[in-house]
C-alpha cells in the first residue's frame, strides 16, 4: 500500500508516465475531515483502453464516487493511473472493476462506487457498475448523471 512514509508523492514533481496499471502508483493523503461523512467524485470523461482481442481502442466515461475514511485519493496519481490503461488490453468489465478495487484497496474508503459508461463497439454500449457495499447512512450521493447511450434514436 502506498503511503507518504513509504513512497514520496508524485504531486509537485516530474514523473514518468506508467506503462501498465500494475506499474502505476496510487498516492493517498490524510483526510483532514475524517470525522465527517462526505462524498468525493472524480469524473473521467475520456478514459481509453484497448480491446484484448482486436487491439482496437475502447472509450468510456468513468464516474468514481467515494466516502473517504482516513485517506483521500491524490488526483495527480489517479490521472497517471488512468493514463496507464491507454495501452492496456482488457474487457470493459475488467477495467471498470479493476479500477474500483485498486482504489478501494489503497485508500480504504467508507464506501466507493464506480460507473463505467462505455461507448459502443459492434453497436452495443456496455455500462459496468461496482461498489464496495451499502451507502453509509445519511450520506448524500447524487446520481452519476450519465445518460444511457441513445445514438440517433
Curated annotation (Swiss-Prot):
Catalytic activity annotation: 7-aminomethyl-7-carbaguanine + 2 NADP(+) = 7-cyano-7-deazaguanine + 2 NADPH + 3 H(+)
Pathway annotation: tRNA modification; tRNA-queuosine biosynthesis
Subcellular location(s) of the protein: Cytoplasm
GO molecular function: preQ1 synthase activity
Binding site for substrate: 73-75, 92-93
Residue pairs linked by disulfide bridges in the UniProt entry: none
Cellular-component GO terms for this entry: cytosol
Active site (record annotation): 51 (thioimide intermediate), 58 (proton donor)
Keywords: Cytoplasm, NADP, Oxidoreductase, Queuosine biosynthesis
Main location: cytoplasm
Described purpose of this protein according to its UniProt entry: Catalyzes the NADPH-dependent reduction of 7-cyano-7-deazaguanine (preQ0) to 7-aminomethyl-7-deazaguanine (preQ1).
PANTHER family: NADPH-DEPENDENT 7-CYANO-7-DEAZAGUANINE REDUCTASE
Protein name in UniProt: NADPH-dependent 7-cyano-7-deazaguanine reductase
Name of the gene this protein is made from: queF
Amino acid at each position: 500500500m502506498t503511503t507518504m512514509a513509504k513512497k514520496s508523492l508524485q504531486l509537485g514533481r516530474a514523473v514518468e508516465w506508467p506503462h501498465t496499471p500494475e506499474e502505476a502508483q496510487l498516492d493517498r493523503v490524510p483526510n483532514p475531515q475524517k470525522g465527517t461523512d462526505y462524498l468525493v467524485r472524480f469524473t473521467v470523461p475520456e478514459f481509453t483502453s484497448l480491446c484484448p482481442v482486436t487491439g482496437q481502442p475502447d472509450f468510456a466515461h468513468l464516474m468514481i464516487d467515494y466516502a473517504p475514511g482516513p485517506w483521500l485519493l491524490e488526483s495527480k496519481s489517479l490521472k497517471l493511473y488512468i493514463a496507464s490503461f491507454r495501452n492496456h488490453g482488457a474487457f470493459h468489465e475488467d477495467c471498470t472493476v479493476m479500477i474500483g478495487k485498486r482504489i478501494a484497496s489503497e485508500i480504504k474508503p467508507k464506501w466507493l462506487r464506480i460507473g463505467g459508461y462505455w461507448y459502443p463497439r459492434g453497436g452495443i454500449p456496455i455500462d459496468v457498475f461496482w461498489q464496495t457495499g451499502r451507502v453509509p447512512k445519511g450520506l448524500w450521493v447524487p446520481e452519476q448523471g450519465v445518460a444511457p447511450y441513445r445514438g440517433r434514436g
